[in-house]
Amino acid sequence: MDKFWAHLIKVQPDPDPWVVAVSALAALVIVSFRMPWQVSRGLITIAHEGGHAVMALLTRRKLEGIRLHSDTSGVTLTRGRPTGPGMVLTALAGYLAPSLLGLGAAWLTEQGLITLLIWGVLLLLVCMLLLIRNLYGALILLVTGGAVFALVMYAPADVQQVVALVSAWFLLFGGVRPIVELQRKRSRRQARDSDADQLARLTVLPGGFYVFFFMLVALVSVAFGAYLMNPL
């Protein structure tokens, strides 16, 4: 156990500045272009629904399960009071989760705790798998978890570091684009049951305020994450 813990908190040396810069560029390309974004967007959905689930548990709502769909949408099913702080916080957590996870990943990467980061991601995926209530969602989590397990068990340290960097940047950039897509749908009246509109019905604030708040947190996370992983 002591050996495993020592392995878990082993600090890797700082990456070369060009590695950080290229990792950021790679993540930005994935998020910016349609085809790679369609392929990878499901990972952001995992983080989004995971955020709802964690907050539901923290606010003592009954978590009934999570569903992930092939169109990269998802839903987290909870039971409890239909109004009140618990419901508000649960609805609020989804769009914030990818950016905050990206910020946490950026901090761990900056600290050189790459192995701890990868094992942490694997643990979160396993916990989420236990809550999945549809076959497609289970398949996606098994594939993602299998890839993460293979990375931590078989990939050399420098490869793990690059993947961790790209993943941190991807979560940070990937936390922004769904908010843009959300507002675009809202402007066309195609997202009446979005998290922002649910929050508007739960509180006195309009849905546009929550879109603004989501975007503010996402952009601040990108800025602070970039500061932490500053290649210069």
Regions found by a protein language model. Give the residues of each.
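Membrane-helix interface "capping/anchor" motifs
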Residues: 36-37, 110-113, 129-141, 156-159
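Divalent metal-coordination and catalytic microenvironments
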Residues: 48-50, 94, 199
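Membrane-interface loop-to-helix entry segments
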Residues: 15, 88-98, 136-139, 209-213
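Structural signature of hydrophobic alpha-helical transmembrane segments
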Residues: 105-122
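Short, strongly hydrophobic alpha-helical membrane anchors
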Residues: 1-15, 232
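C-terminal membrane-associated helical module and adjoining short loops/tails
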Residues: 139-232
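Hydrophobic, membrane-inserted alpha-helices
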Residues: 24-27, 100-104, 121-129, 143-151
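Small-residue-rich helix-interface/hinge motifs
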Residues: 33-87
